[in-house]
Swiss-Prot record:
GO cellular component, one term: Golgi apparatus
UniProt keyword annotation of Protein biosynthesis present: no
Covalent lipid adducts (N-myristoyl glycine), residues: 2
Keywords of this entry: Cytoplasm, Golgi apparatus, Lipoprotein, Myristate
Cellular localisation: Cytoplasm; Golgi apparatus
Domain of life assignment: Eukaryota
Major location (coarse): cytoplasm
Family: Belongs to the dymeclin family.
Known function: Necessary for correct organization of Golgi apparatus.
Record PTM text: Myristoylated in vitro; myristoylation is not essential for protein targeting to Golgi compartment.
Name assigned to this protein: Dymeclin
Length: 669
């Protein structure tokens, strides 16, 4: 990007910025504003450039914080911006770039000033800065004008009403960024903000009727994934005839004052990363996640969450029995396609989770798709590369699978989808496998990874719950999937024996010893036995419900039959072992009768014949395994820090000093 730190530092001495932050009041009608706002450069697109820019202008911002109570210059700048935006929609339609250019520049400065304000002063003090007027020190305006609310309303209006074109891309991105910055006080608090003046302004008053339009626009920005136009697309172009007086003034200022800002460089070649990026889509998604996770006000449920919860498909003509004022309609096919294509990012996975969990219309639509593999495969790839992902991303992917496996139709259909050559699955060549078998392989691999590395009980529980939900519908399991189920049981069995041995030795060693407390092996044993019980229930569910569909499962069971002997008489497993024991005995006898040295093909043939002959009434019926995902109490304690960690790590052109962050630790995102 080529940000030049030496020239960035010159900004602190820039005469226009010094005047803005100085001790003299500037009227909204002065030519100063045309001079200040006539600069040309590309907005920073990464945190490194933003850090340089913030460091270069920090002294200016601090001066404004000190002098604004007497000058009211922040309010004057905002009023200038508001006046420039009045003609924006017409300017966009008429390709009038001057208004858009100056409005963008005004908003860019406002956003950078407020960004520093939020890290230096409280939310209440910030709102007070919007009220200061020139004249007497500390003099502020009457209640008839709420400048902060006007700015908030203007930003939302701008996002929802200005068409997305090359020349409006930058100002739309800046408006979305400005809303994120205004909400960023949460970053500097360890506790979750339940009461916030800024939140109240968003959820009530003139902003409230725009809730559904804002959510819809942010979603469409995500769906469209519009690439950033070449740097300088929003800038007033050089005219061959020299242009008019206004252009001449703007051009002179741009070349003489602001060329120190070489972030990206106007007209410089974008890097391949820039060419591929869709900053507006990314920033819109981050804002949507932040808004939808705001806590409810005491007298007002979060309207953004309501909007996310109740929106419907454009092709849905039915009348909702309980219409919500913040609902809207959007093209679900386009949304589904975008969700499938973008799952490599945490924020897209969090959006998918949010929609599947909260919006029953989206969940019903997704489960009815005939191309479910387009959504499931990216989720499985996230889990397969578990070591490269943060724990939150893995959790979201797992919970998405758990939600999907709550549906019997999903559990049946995934075994009918045949995949060829899954290139990212490198442990074994899978030339042909069903989506269901691949799902089983990846979930089991995740459990095994967790057993050896993180040892997270919560992760185990979700993995096993997904397998349990699927187990009654297992169909034509791939031989490798069947082997891995039994291999996992083998691993658990060895772990059980090891813990049992440690507990026995510990007990012997503690006799006659008065030393410090020993490890709680009883608790370890209890946990491992819970997991073993769950695995036995999954195997049992497959055998009792779909044995005749799964010869490979019976084959794997018989091949490792000795694993199950030690659990036959164990009081925790006796009941569930009855069916497994009976199946092993039944098929072992038939194989003995078939003769010695049987080929794999012949063994499978005997199993298939035996499956038809096995009396179903000999298998004891157990309750169907059904697990449902339930969000924990106070979900905001997890989701608000997670959403903001994504803003911190993935926000376009946003930098916060890591030492100022209180909401989460740097390794949690």
């Amino acid at each position: 990007m080529g940000a030049n730190s030496s020239t960035i530092k010159e900004l602190s001495e820039n005469e226009f910025l010094k005047k803005l932050s100085g001790t003299d009041s500037i009227s909204e009608n002065e030519p100063f504003w045309n001079q200040l706002l006539s600069f040309s450069f590309s907005t920073p697109t990464n945190s490194a450039d933003s850090k340089l820019l913030e460091e270069g202008t920090l002294s200016i911002c601090k001066s404004l914080i000190e002098n604004n109570p007497r000058t009211g210059n922040l309010g004057a700048l905002i009023r200038v911006f508001l006046s420039r935006t009045k003609e924006l929609k017409i300017s966009a339609e008429c390709q009038n770039q001057l208004f858009i250019w100056q409005a963008h520049n005004a908003l860019f400065i406002i956003c950078r000033l407020i960004k520093v304000f939020t890290s230096q002063i409280s939310e209440e003090e910030l709102l007070l800065h919007f009220t200061y007027r020139p004249a007497d020190p500390g003099n502020y305006e009457s209640d008839t004008e709420n400048l902060f609310e006007e700015l908030l309303f203007c930003l939302i209006q701008l996002i929802v009403e200005i068409p997305l074109l090359d020349l409006t891309y930058s100002i739309l991105l800046e408006a979305v960024t400005a809303l994120i910055v205004l909400l960023s006080y949460q970053l500097f608090r360890k506790d979750i903000l339940h009461e916030s003046p800024i939140h109240r302004h968003l959820m009530k008053g003139p902003c409230l009727p725009y809730t559904s339009r804002l959510v819809k626009t942010l979603l469409y920005n995500f769906i469209r994934q519009e690439k950033s136009p070449p740097p300088g697309s929003h800038i007033f172009p050089q005219q061959q005839d020299g242009g008019g007086l206004l252009y001449g003034l703007a051009s002179g200022v741009a070349s003489g004052i602001w060329t120190v800002l070489t972030l990206g460089g106007v007209g410089s070649k974008p890097t391949p990363q820039q060419e591929q990026s869709s900053p507006l889509a990314n920033q819109s998604l981050l804002l949507l996640l932040v808004l939808s996770n705001l806590t409810d006000a005491p007298d007002c449920p979060n309207p953004f969450r309501q909007s996310v919860t109740f929106f419907r498909n454009t092709q849905d003509s039915s009348v909702s029995p309980t219409p919500n004022p913040h609902s809207f309609q959007i093209n679900f096919n386009s949304l589904y396609t975008a969700l499938c294509e973008q799952q490599k990012s945490d924020q897209a996975t969090l959006l998918l989770y949010t929609l599947l969990h909260q919006n029953s219309n989206v969940r019903t639509y997704v489960l009815a798709r005939s191309d479910m593999e387009n959504l499931v495969l990216p989720i499985l790839e996230i889990l397969y590369h578990v070591e490269d992902r943060n724990s939150h991303h893995v959790y979201m992917a797992l919970i998405i699978l758990l939600i999907l496996t709550e549906d019997d139709g999903f559990n049946r259909s995934i075994h009918e989808v045949i995949l060829k050559n899954i290139t990212w699955y490198t442990e074994r060549v899978l030339t042909e496998i069903s989506l269901g078998s691949l799902l089983i392989l990846v979930v089991i691999r995740t459990i095994q990874y967790n057993m050896t590395r993180t040892r997270d009980k919560y992760l185990h529980t979700n993995c096993l719950a997904a397998l349990a939900n699927m187990s009654a519908q297992f169909r034509s399991l791939h031989q490798y999937a069947a082997q891995r189920i039994i291999s996992l049981f083998s691993l658990l069995s060895k772990k059980h024996n090891k813990v049992l041995e440690q507990a026995t030795q510990s007990l012997r060693g503690s006799l006659g010893s008065d030393e410090s407390p020993l490890p709680d092996y009883a608790q370890d044993l209890n946990v491992i036995e819970e997991v073993i019980r769950m695995m036995l229930e999954i195997i049992n569910s497959c055998l009792t419900n779909s044995l005749h569909h799964n010869p490979n499962m019976v084959y794997a069971l018989l091949y490792k039959r000795e694993l199950f002997e030690q659990f036959r008489s164990h009081p925790s497993f006796q009941d569930i072992m009855q069916n497994i024991d009976m199946v092993i005995s039944f098929f072992s006898l038939r194989l003995e009768q078939a003769g010695a040295d049987l080929s794999v093909e012949r063994v499978l043939e005997v199993i298939k014949q035996g499956a038809v002959a096995l009396p179903k009434d000999r298998l004891r019926k157990f309750p169907e395994l059904k697990f449902k995902y339930v969000e924990e109490e106070q979900p905001e304690e997890f989701f608000i820090p997670y959403a903001w960690s994504l803003v911190y790590h993935s926000g376009v052109g946003l930098y916060w000093n890591p030492q100022d962050i209180q909401l989460f630790t740097m390794d949690s995102g």
